[in-house]
Amino acid sequence: MQQALELALDRAEYVIESARQRPPKRKYLSSGRKSVFQKLYDLYIEECEKEPEVKKLRRNVNLLEKLVMQETLSCLVVNLYPGNEGYSLMLRGKNGSDSETIRLPYEEGELLEYLDAEELPPILVDLLEKSQVNIFHCGCVIAEIRDYRQSSNMKSPGYQSRHILLRPTMQTLICDVHSITSDNHKWTQEDKLLLESQLILATAEPLCLDPSIAVTCTANRLLYNKQKMNTRPMKRCFKRYSRSSLNRQQDLSHCPPPPQLRLLDFLQKRKERKAGQHYDLKISKAGNCVDMWKRSPCNLAIPSEVDVEKYAKVEKSIKSDDSQPTVWPAHDVKDDYVFECEAGTQYQKTKLTILQSLGDPLYYGKIQPCKADEESDSQMSPSHSSTDDHSNWFIIGSKTDAERVVNQYQELVQNEAKCPVKMSHSSSGSASLSQVSPGKETDQTETVSVQSSVLGKGVKHRPPPIKLPSSSGNSSSGNYFTPQQTSSFLKSPTPPPSSKPSSIPRKSSVDLNQVSMLSPAALSPASSSQRTTATQVMANSAGLNFINVVGSVCGAQALMSGSNPMLGCNTGAITPAGINLSGLLPSGGLLPNALPSAMQAASQAGVPFGLKNTSSLRPLNLLQLPGGSLIFNTLQQQQQQLSQFTPQQPQQPTTCSPQQPGEQGSEQGSTSQEQALSAQQAAVINLTGVGSFMQSQAAVLSQLGSAENRPEQSLPQQRFQLSSAFQQQQQQIQQLRFLQHQMAMAAAAAQTAQLHHHRHTGSQSKSKMKRGTPTTPKF
């Protein structure tokens, strides 16, 4: 079957090509009148016999135009006008002049569709029959299409003409039957059917009854060659650029697009905008361009001298404000800068607030849009606002930094708005804004992390800060330290002796997740190898203040001594062999009148204390307890005292004996000095005397020692009883007990260092045993 079909297609191609080159001649009756089809066939044979004037061109085309010119046949004229003028129909009269009968717009394209299909429109049958000139030729009508749309001269427009033969269809035959039978004669239904059959036979083309499949293939090939450019996809493309379609698009462009076509409208406008851009691209002439592929490498000689001053740009460096003295304000200072601008139709108004709280040398800033309730928001300082408002304030620094922030923000607003910016400034100050109620100060939990730069060379990375749970049980205080919280711990009427007092509140932080860093042994009973009588301090409801001193102490020894100031420390500079804690805390004592006079006298006497052999020291933890003692505690004692950490009833504080230093020197014997030098003992130091703290407080230094705990040293243990306030805070105590696991892990990590210092500590103790009366250790 496939082979037969291929043979039929080849036969069809051969028949078409032979008929085109050598068409056969037909014989007609001599007495008969030739039809328009016979005339076209004879003209086709005549043109095929002639030699073409130009090779590869055929003459047997445009036969209908040649026939009209030879015989001057009457035809129907269709004019296609440019723009929105539409099209019209014209009929030729007896005098030879053409008269326009119908003029229609392009939107009514039904008549044009019949002309495109070369079919006789049924609506024109009655009009054409009533014309003065007979334009029918064997039932067909010759139409001349005059196209004025391609003419460039509108004054005397020319046109392109082509002829088509409109053939009758079944609809036109029905119209003919109806017009013939509409006279006064009576036509039966059988007569009408007989008339219709005769009309179909007279107008139908001759049939080919050859059963070969090649006949069908030939007919299909001829029809395809005739309608190859008249398919539905081609018609759809042509209609897209037709006049009716362009008019519809122009009308819709003035109307708002529907919601479904907003994206399409946006893309269309962007496409038109990009198409309208003209680029000035100049193509250089041949020979003027540089061939990048064949260009030789450029070898430039290095100049011997370069004028640096000609190309250099001098930029002034920003000087640090460390040399400027820190000013502790006596009341709150708040500056409001309001920036107003009108960019187009939008009015923008923002406010920059610069705030300096009482007792805090740092400046804080806040940027917010101006609203109706801006007055209520501006009355809240960073230290008294809610925890949700902490994120709105940011640390600026010194006064010079605050001025720089104002200038930079003004330039930023002016650059974004691209219009003049109006700035108004208002300043206000009130000392009542920074006062803290007693209840709030009690509930606060303060954590200060001091960098290792205070102690010399230490670790590079700061360990995570420690957060103690507040007495109220509220965990919302886990935000960063506010200026008021910092100033409550470092509050002093005079500038502190530290060279950088602002380094503590800048790097302060609170983290509730790091509560496990605090050793529970810091709250356990303190013990001392010197048999020092530990003062039982009554703890009040004040919060716990904790300072984490990061990094190890540099140097071979660390000496801390002094008189009246806190921790018995000097206010001098930090020497390579010692640590000065006066830079950590403000000058002045801790307990103004909270402890007995005996303890005050003992602390005012200025008993020095020393820490030697600091190569085995670990980061120090300074815990400020609501009491009056300073406890140095080590890892081994913390583990022994962990089981004894139970809340007890508060007891009255007892005073230390003035003969305590001498008593220690007599009873300790030859081992007192090496015990004082080791990191395994606990010493109690009374903190009394001057200070500006509102409540009686103490500090606990918890040191993780790395020396080996020798069995011959039995350290007496003493209970450090807490008040009933801690008994009510069971949640705090449970959280502190969870640190046992982490302390055990720290002890395991210190075993390597303990083995390293075992021989050194043994030889040192033997050498000191041979000496005379040991010196009194300093506290």
Curated annotation (Swiss-Prot):
Residues 424-437, 470-479 have a biased composition (Low complexity). It is found in: Nucleus. Residues 755-771 have a biased composition (Basic residues). Residues 373-392, 420-507, 641-677, 755-779 are annotated as: Disordered. It comes from Homo sapiens (Human). Interacts with MAPK14. Interacts with ATG9A. InterPro entries: Spt20 (IPR021950), Spt20-like_SEP (IPR046468). GO terms for molecular function: transcription coregulator activity. Its main location: nucleus. The modification Phosphoserine is found at residues 296, 519, 524. Pfam families: Spt20_SEP (PF12090). The modification Phosphothreonine is found at residue 494. Keywords: Autophagy, Developmental protein, Gastrulation, Nucleus, Phosphoprotein. Residues 445-454 have a biased composition (Polar residues). This is Transcription factor SPT20 homolog. Required for MAP kinase p38 (MAPK11, MAPK12, MAPK13 and/or MAPK14) activation during gastrulation. Required for down-regulation of E-cadherin during gastrulation by regulating E-cadherin protein level downstream from NCK-interacting kinase (NIK) and independently of the regulation of transcription by FGF signaling and Snail. Required for starvation-induced ATG9A trafficking during autophagy. One of its GO terms (cellular component) is nucleus. Belongs to the SPT20 family. GO terms for biological process: autophagy; gastrulation; positive regulation of DNA-templated transcription; regulation of DNA repair; regulation of RNA splicing; regulation of transcription by RNA polymerase II. Highly expressed in testis, moderately in brain and pituitary gland. Expressed in several fetal tissues, including lung, brain, thymus and kidney. Expression is down-regulated in malignant prostate tissues.
